[in-house]
Amino acid sequence: MEQTQTAEGTDLLIGDEKTNDLPFVQLFLEEIGCTQYLDSFIQCNLVTEEEIKYLDKDILIALGVNKIGDRLKILRKSKSFQRDKRIEQVNRLKNLMEKVSSLSTATLSMNSELIPEKHCVIFILNDGSAKKVNVNGCFNADSIKKRLIRRLPHELLATNSNGEVTKMVQDYDVFVLDYTKNVLHLLYDVELVTICHANDRVEKNRLIFVSKDQTPSDKAISTSKKLYLRTLSALSQVGPSSSNLLAQNKGISHNNAEGKLRIDNTEKDRIRQIFNQRPPSEFISTNLAGYFPHTDMKRLQKTMRESFRHSARLSIAQRRPLSAESNNIGDILLKHSNAVDMALLQGLDQTRLSSKLDTTKIPKLAHKRPEDNDAISNQLELLSVESGEEEDHDFFGEDSDIVSLPTKIATPKNWLKGACIGSGSFGSVYLGMNAHTGELMAVKQVEIKNNNIGVSTDNNKQANSDENNEQEEQQEKIEDVGAVSHPKTNQNIHRKMVDALQHEMNLLKELHHENIVTYYGASQEGGNLNIFLEYVPGGSVSSMLNNYGPFEESLITNFTRQILIGVAYLHKKKIIHRDIKGANILIDIKGCVKITDFGISKKLSPLNKKQNKRASLQGSVFWMSPEVVKQSATTAKADIWSTGCVVIEMFTGKHPFPDFSQMQAIFKIGTNTTPEIPSWATSEGKNFLRKAFELDYQYRPGALELLQHPWLDAHII
């Protein structure tokens, strides 16, 4: 009774609010049999659930709860309030999701039909409305856009510079909202086609379609969000069959709630999967229109036809089997044709075959004359080129035995430009195809302004190119966030981009190695400077890590061995790459490593060693060696350090010093801090990395020495 009176007296002192709260603390302590501590709780003003749920051992001791048993009972009960609170928050979130899901746009009924359909895509217009389009039969971005443009209301059509309404596909863009970073992503043509024809891409239900002179409006973005949430809600109700889709599109993460939808933070990478990975040549050959969306169809068809005939001619003249690794469109089509022919021949009755055919000629039957190839061309839909425009040539006439075969791929005089597949140190990289031979290429391209120099192919200009450029070289890879854009600065940067591309061209001329991208030539046309390089289907180490996560150690040793072989070749040629990193290491679909991007590479000469001038700061920060950061020396050993950083990338899926900014990383490296070596690496792997990260470059082993390290032999068997 005394306690009650005391409590009531205190209750009157602290006011009506506390009067209402007292029953809670009383019930709390009575439930666990600890009412003897009620006065202490009231005196310390610990009377509400919000205050009690944060109790800990020290607070209870201060309150005079000295018995361990009582402390345990109070703590267990208080922690249960936190769990109840989390459950309540989860329920609130679910209710909120249901309310949002119940929203609908004015022109679209959002129901279970939002589960991705094979041939249907939903485009959101800038007025917030949405249209469902059947894209069946549309195998390039232009045809998809045309099908939608025909259905656009007049007020949403684009206008040209003269203010006239236009229905040209190049006047429209397609965006998709990336919910991981709250940014709008402009789709490449290849990405648009890939998304539209994929069964497991829920982005196809919320593509935003606008004219080039506009950006997605708030109404369009709002509709996109509603469609996105409704799609996830519909997927969750479908059951196990949609589990993969949900796993790929989980959403909006909240640390204090469990068991709810999240947006996968790799969604943007998934959208750009084709962009990053460089699709295989055979995949491109089945959808050339999609990968060369801006190329005239007749010209593309003519190129395919000529490439097919050229491959047939060389195959018979050389008596050579077709290479499975060829990037030539004609070789791929001919290989498919031959495979069908051989299957048909093997299926013939052996008695009929022996009586009607000379078996010694069977292998040659796979190589058809161009006249016979017309039937195959019909299947490939190549015959839209009128027969009067191009007559069948007799490739196998009297002179067929004295055909002059090229020993290497010549610089293409005429080529077709395809989709953008990446970017290098300077400029963008496009998919290209030799218009005469059908050979696929990677074309590195930089726009040349009026006051820039043209392409120089004279070898004698290379000798002084490094010295002339050294004083002007920019620190291009280090992002200066505080830099102010200036017209003259931009002009100088653009000039250096062109110089770097010419410099890369001059270096690549000298390089012929399995682990270095092959140089096909260069040209200057249409205000652009082009370098034609070997097309490497597959992707970079960086893109593979983004898509698949860290590698197994056996795979790391395989790739590292090939990287070092390529680096050793470069160093033998007195060339320092200076930008070895995961993004510049390409892996083809056969697992062969190709080192690329020589935009800031340097060729050493005796003059380099005599000069006392300070070394320039070149490269990508997180892969830089201490001597590069300190600008104390220009040496091939910098590539060894960078190779070690690539090994770290492959082990962890992240670059070295992942928790630091670029300036912080520069400070760390400059103060002789080495990258952290993965604890799960084998002892040989750790030893390899310690050698690669030797701080003194004079004691750091070279590529040939590291190639003999036991770690690189440990996983060969």
From Swiss-Prot:
Residue numbers carrying Phosphoserine: 323, 465
SUPFAM superfamilies reported in the protein's UniProt record: Protein kinase-like (PK-like) (SSF56112), SAM/Pointed domain (SSF47769)
GO biological process: response to pheromone
Location of the region described as Disordered in the Swiss-Prot/TrEMBL record: 453-479
Pfam family, one: Ras_bdg_2
SAM domain: residues covered: 20-84
GO molecular function, one term: MAP kinase kinase kinase activity
Annotated residues for binding of ATP: 421-429, 444
Residues at the catalytic site: 579 (proton acceptor)
Catalytic activity: L-seryl-[protein] + ATP = O-phospho-L-seryl-[protein] + ADP + H(+); L-threonyl-[protein] + ATP = O-phospho-L-threonyl-[protein] + ADP + H(+)
EC id: 2.7.11.25
Amino acid composition bias (Polar residues), ranges on this chain: 453-466
Keywords annotated in UniProt: ATP-binding, Kinase, Nucleotide-binding, Pheromone response, Phosphoprotein, Serine/threonine-protein kinase, Transferase
Gene3D superfamilies: Phosphatidylinositol 3-kinase Catalytic Subunit, Chain A, domain 1, Transcription Factor, Ets-1, Transferase(Phosphotransferase) domain 1
Protein kinase domain boundaries: 415-712
UniProt key word Oxidoreductase: no
Subunit structure: Homodimer. Interacts (via SAM domain) with STE50 (via SAM domain).
Its job: Serine/threonine protein kinase required for cell-type-specific transcription and signal transduction in yeast. It is thought that it phosphorylates the STE7 protein kinase which itself, phosphorylates the FUS3 and or KSS1 kinases.
Similarity comment: Belongs to the protein kinase superfamily. STE Ser/Thr protein kinase family. MAP kinase kinase kinase subfamily.
Name listed for the protein in its UniProt record: Serine/threonine-protein kinase STE11
